[in-house]
A protein has these predicted regions:
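Active-site loop immediately N-terminal to the catalytic Tyr-X3-Lys motif
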Residues: 9-15, 91
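A conserved structural motif in NAD(P)-dependent oxidoreductases
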Residues: 70-81
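Residue(s) in the substrate-gating loop at a strand-loop-helix junction
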Residues: 4
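Conserved SDR Rossmann-fold cofactor-binding beta-strand/turn motif
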Residues: 40-50, 89, 102-104
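Short, flexible catalytic-loop segment of classical short-chain dehydrogenase/reductase
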Residues: 8, 45-56
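Alpha-helical segment proximal to the catalytic Tyr-Lys
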Residues: 32-37
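Active-site helix of classical SDR
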Residues: 20, 28
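Short C-terminal tail/terminal secondary-structure segment
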Residues: 9, 86, 97-113
Length: 113
């Protein structure tokens, strides 16, 4: 599943989005138990990366700078997310199920930023 790091903290104007992603994570955990051992089920919780959904935010340089300041490792790219997904799809993750993988450049640990 692709969820969002927003499911792990509150964010102004994101209550419905955060709640829906929290539901995705809950479903993931239930399915991980129900489908084991035949199927592994996990969630990837990306931070904000440049996508079609966020493209409008990248038109404002001041906004981009404020967003980047909240990420200890700086802004991420889509490839940072798909590398985690590729790991989870590989045999290297054969003993991984029911887990949330937060891939957000440290944003979740820097909530005040």
């Amino acid at each position: 599943f692709i969820s969002s790091n927003i499911s792990n903290f509150g964010a102004k104007a994101f209550s419905v989005y955060g709640a829906s992603k929290g539901a995705v994570d809950s479903l993931m955990r239930s399915l991980a138990v129900e489908l084991a051992p035949r199927v592994r089920v996990n969630s990837v919780l990306p931070g904000g990366v440049r996508t079609a959904m966020t493209e409008h935010m990248y038109q404002d340089e001041n906004l981009v700078n404020r967003i980047a300041a909240a990420y200890p490792l700086g802004l991420g790219e889509v490839k940072d997310i798909y590398m985690t997904v590729n790991f989870l799809l590989s045999d290297a993750a054969r003993w991984v199920t029911g887990q949330q993988f937060t891939v957000d450049g440290g944003r979740t640990i820097n909530i005040t930023g």
